[in-house]
Amino acid sequence: MPKRMQDLPEEYLTNQHALARAIGARVRLRRSELNLTQEHLRARMELEQVFISRTQYSRIENGDVLPNAAELIALRAILDVPFDWLLLGEKGEP
């Protein structure tokens, strides 16, 4: 297993970045539909026992990073969307 990001195959990095951007766009879209600010959503994540900085949350929405498992679970619950929509953008549209 590669120990550094630069040791990962280019295809993996390209797919990972594309997935991060797509998830971030869906999170932003659904947050806007619910009329929540980033800060409101972040505060609700804390109620779900997921503590995330303002910067980290912004990086998720901007597609700079993939959310971890706990963040995905909290986002799914708060945004009231199915995991398949959040991750893949298909089936069970919100």
Where are these regions (language model features)?
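Short, basic-rich loop-to-helix N-cap that marks the start of a DNA-contacting helix
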Residues: N62-A77, E93
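Residue-level detection of the helix-turn-helix DNA-binding "recognition helix"
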Residues: S32, E46-L47, N62-D64, K91
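Helix-turn-helix DNA-binding elements, focusing on the entry/boundary residues of the two helices
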Residues: V27, Q38, R54, A69-L72
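Short, basic amphipathic alpha-helical segments that act as recognition/interaction helices
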Residues: V81, G89-G92
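A short, Lys/Arg-rich alpha-helix, primarily the initiator
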Residues: P2-L34
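Short alpha-helical DNA-recognition segment
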Residues: L34-R59
